[in-house]
Amino acid sequence: ERSRRPPRNEINAVLSFVYTLQTRDIQAALETANLDPAAGWLHTLRPGRPSLALDLLEEFRAPLCDRLVLSLFNKHQLTDKDFEYDSLAVMLNERGRKTVLTAWRDRKQEEITHPYLGEKIQVGLIAYVQAMMLARVLRGDLDCYPPFVWR
């Protein structure tokens, strides 16, 4: 079961951390595409909340974020020594954050074939490509938004 604010187990602690990393990447991509990260459709608009970035995050949760987190645990790259525990929360310690950040960096450098463009791109550029396509839709240059669907 998903728990957050605070995460109550190791998997939720890493999911929250990776979702935050991906959200920041999406925010930067949206700003590069001259889109306001706060002006979303799916997530409630609140001051300081990057609603549009959170909207786009939904496309990336399973294929990028969740897959990376499960891989870290399945390959035993994270152990109980990578976490701090108290009665209310489980948090990554410095060693755990370093492990996740290294895996995140490595993952972003891998290449995939973008399902819509049919071109090889680095995983780290997917948010930028999607933000640019969303901007093209909003400008009327593209008829509909092609979501990132990776098999």
Feature names for model-found ranges:
Residues 1-151:
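Active-site helix-to-loop segments that bind/position phosphate- or nucleotide-bearing substrates
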